[in-house]
Amino acid sequence: MESAPGAETIIGGKRRLYFAGTSYFGLHGHADLIRAGVKAFQKYGTHSATSRAGFGNNPVLLEVEEQLKEFFGETDAAYFGSGYLSSLVLAQSLAEKYDAVFVDEAAHFCIADSAHSLGKPVYRFRHRDAGDLRRKLQTKLKPRQTPFLMTDGVFPTYGYIAPVPDYLDVITPYKGLIGLDDAHGVGVLGPNGRGTYEHFGVASEGLHLAGTLSKAFGGHGGFIVGGKKLIAGARTTAGAYIGSTPTPTPIAAAAAKGIEILRSHPEMRDRLRKNVSLVKAGLKKLGVPIDDTPVPIVAWSTGSAEKMKKVQRLLMNRGIAIAYLKYIGAPSEGVLRVTVFSTHTVEHISRLLKELATAL
């Protein structure tokens, strides 16, 4: 890749239509984000070179947290150097409130790594299976223990959404907690872009949200949002927050601008949803199995790794980049994966579908 990711991206020296990655709103190359980053670079240098527990705070990092509070309608937020740390910071912040951890078997690496670092029993349940979660709670949880469920909000390979309302029904009798790493849901799902919880319209004191600014928002770094007590816990007890260097200040400045833009322009989500509907309808006509949700991810397997690699090469030669990957939740032969952006035009989408019809 030799340009910012967007609907048209330079790859291998050629401008191609880009239907991969996670720049759902094309903000990574947005002029306002770049200007904000350059201005911060000139004033603050590369980064604070120390933890936020020391002298690492600066007005830019605090502005990101203010923007997060406004975007998610929460009373406080904690922002740190990597989205990979989000689940860990959340789990460490809540550590005194649960006794055992239950993890979706297809959870992202960062969730699994976090769960196994906590020093508490960890149990895996079948992918997106509330019934199996119930059985695991019944057989593994000891009397008077509180469970903590850790899962993706939107799973990265296929874009499937975790059945949060079902999980809430199952875990509430145990007074359990849910920690949702909504990396692919925030900014995208829900009327205000607040993610999977808002998509389902669920709310509970036991629901907790972690996410990243590296996808929809065009920036970088992880975050958790919630009440004052939760965030105070992150700042005083979460080693992953206390002991890490914050996001480089220029990138944080760009992230703050990205949050502001996405909050101020809900029509960007409207365009994304229209494009998602257009792509999914077209792929369905080609016989591709479709999960009919607003998630801008479609992945499928033809059953043959060689065939899928060939399809990817054919499209690349025709000036269109889609992904072939072996990732979490994918079968052994891998999948073809298409990602949709709000910045794709009808012409871009028509060309993608036309070339796929020939290649498949």
Q: Which residues fall in each region the model found?
A:
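Conserved N-terminal alpha-helix of the aminotransferase class I/II PLP-enzyme fold
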Residues: 35, 39-82
